[in-house]
């Protein structure tokens, strides 16, 4: 192309040869489902949580098994209105 704007003679068209047999573009590859399961299992981890009972102020240990996103949600709930009560205080009420 010469000049600032293209003209019709600047455009070159090529003939695409046609095939007598159609080309199959379908991909017959299948993913192994165990890879997806392994990935999901890797995302789930155990977390140890040490918090304080809101009634008697004793330490309460929790172990949860969840994804990182879920542990972040739990953290936000603990910072909000969610309170943990120890088993002794739970029996009293």
Curated annotation (Swiss-Prot):
Q: Where is this region: E7 terminal domain?
A: 1-42
Its GO biological process terms? DNA-templated transcription; symbiont-mediated perturbation of host cell cycle G1/S transition checkpoint; symbiont-mediated suppression of host innate immune response; symbiont-mediated suppression of host type I interferon-mediated signaling pathway
**Motif LXCXE motif boundaries:** 25-29
User: A GO molecular-function term, please?
Assistant: DNA-binding transcription factor activity
Give the protein's function.
Plays a role in viral genome replication by driving entry of quiescent cells into the cell cycle. Stimulation of progression from G1 to S phase allows the virus to efficiently use the cellular DNA replicating machinery to achieve viral genome replication. E7 protein has both transforming and trans-activating activities. Induces the disassembly of the E2F1 transcription factor from RB1, with subsequent transcriptional activation of E2F1-regulated S-phase genes. Interferes with host histone deacetylation mediated by HDAC1 and HDAC2, leading to transcription activation.
How does the record comment on the protein's domains?
A: The E7 terminal domain is an intrinsically disordered domain, whose flexibility and conformational transitions confer target adaptability to the oncoprotein. It allows adaptation to a variety of protein targets and exposes the PEST degradation sequence that regulates its turnover in the cell.
Give the protein's recorded name. Answer: Protein E7
